[in-house]
Design a protein with these regions (language model features):
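Short, flexible micro-motifs
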Residues: 29, 40, 80, 84
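Ribosome large-subunit tunnel/peptidyl-transferase-proximal elements
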Residues: 1-38
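Amphipathic coiled-coil/heptad-repeat helices and related helical stalk/stem segments
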Residues: 26-27, 52, 72
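N-terminal positively charged helical leader segments and presequences
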Residues: 30-59, 64
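Short basic, glycine-rich beta-strand/loop surfaces that mediate nucleic-acid
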Residues: 58-93
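A short linear-motif detector with a strong N-terminal bias
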Residues: 3, 21-23, 45-47, 66-71
């Protein structure tokens, strides 16, 4: 991540919500979904381990998959409807 401006703005809201959308949660599941196709948007948490998020961000850039940073793992986990943090998640079709 280059600057704070790269953090997802949550569409003018202070929260991110994926309810009603098909979501893949977690780095392993996300990598599998990226290989299989059908990923619409990838999100990664700024406070997640760069060893996890770095390769995901690079894959997205190399394969023209939309990518955005989220402020924290807790925010991303809540958006996905889980009670724990998530390093990465994706909206899928």
């Amino acid at each position: 991540m280059d600057t704070q401006n790269d953090i997802l703005a949550y569409n003018g809201k202070n929260s991110l919500d994926f309810s009603g959308r098909r979501v893949v949660v977690g780095a392993k599941q996300l990598k599998k979904a990226l290989r299989n196709g059908g990923v619409l948007q990838v999100y990664a948490a700024c406070n997640a381990d760069p060893a996890i998020t770095g390769p995901i961000e690079a894959y997205c850039k190399d394969h023209s998959v939309a990518f955005a940073w989220v402020k924290s793992m807790a925010d991303l986990g809540r958006a996905c409807g889980i009670e724990v943090g998530a390093a990465a998640a994706a909206l899928v079709d």
